[in-house]
From Swiss-Prot:
It catalyses: adenosine(1067) in 23S rRNA + S-adenosyl-L-methionine = 2'-O-methyladenosine(1067) in 23S rRNA + S-adenosyl-L-homocysteine + H(+). The lineage of its organism: Bacteria, Bacillati, Actinomycetota, Actinomycetes, Kitasatosporales. This is 23S rRNA (adenosine(1067)-2'-O)-methyltransferase. Pfam families: SpoU_methylase (PF00588), TSNR_N (PF04705). Changing residue 35 to A: Loss of activity. Changing residue 36 to A: Significantly decreases activity. Belongs to the class IV-like SAM-binding methyltransferase superfamily. RNA methyltransferase TsnR/AvirB family. Transmembrane segments: none annotated. Specifically methylates the adenosine-1067 in 23S ribosomal RNA. Confers resistance to antibiotic nosiheptide. The keyword Secreted does not apply. Keywords: Antibiotic resistance, Methyltransferase, S-adenosyl-L-methionine, Transferase. InterPro entries: Alpha/beta_knot_MTases, Ribosomal_eL30-like_sf, rRNA_Methyltransferase, SpoU_MeTrfase, Thiostrepton-R_Mease_TSNR_N, tRNA_m1G_MTases_N. It comes from the Bacteria. One of its GO terms (molecular function) is RNA binding.
Amino acid sequence: MTEPAIITNASDPAVQRIIDVTKHSRASIKTTLIEDTEPLMECIRAGVQFIEVYGSSGTPLDPALLDLCRQREIPVRLIDVSIVNQLFKAERKAKVFGIARVPRPARLADIAERGGDVVVLDGVKIVGNIGAIVRTSLALGAAGIVLVDSDLATIADRRLLRASRGYVFSLPVVLADREEAVSFLRDNDIALMVLDTDGDLGVKDLGDRADRMALVFGSEKGGPSGLFQEASAGTVSIPMLSSTESLNVSVSVGIALHERSARNFAVRRAAAQA
């Protein structure tokens, strides 16, 4: 097995490319930095196109990552640890990372083509929560996620890539406004169910329904907006002790999707066999 070459010169074009990608003020985001072995491998499997993958010269690269890069013909090089330290002066120093081309943004039509339930996050802004919800939604068979008023300019945001462990490109995650989201759900006959503290239904009731749903979750402070409340086919609550004010939104999504998982898994199996 040939060892990756080591970049020892800070003037190497790859070093400047990394500097450019990590600038916070970029007007146009066409490439992004993806850090750590697991997110890199997940993004590669999801079909994200990588320009190159890098490792710090002081840390061995995972053989599984090297094999995957070789299979997909992705160049791999090491960077001298002193240069890595300069590249990531004021932030967490990545030991392995890659420069990737940002995929085409997912569209609502991409979600429509899939049969699973839709997760709508209305005003959820904490990136760590969004990342956890991405992973849970993928694991429990959701068709995709619609982010409304998330304050994210792109799903290629490095914070979201970290929080989702790279899974953000493995299912459609769409940025939309409230009107677009409601129109999309109506046009595709997807029943809109709002999670609320005083719901008409209990979360267990979700498992009894065979129709496709959009599960709407608001922020822990504000809850879902009036537009989603008005458009809803019903409201759903998660039983909990009265001494607990609320659940973390990522936990609520996990509970609701677990109740819907049998239905969503069946849809996924049927699509795979078609």
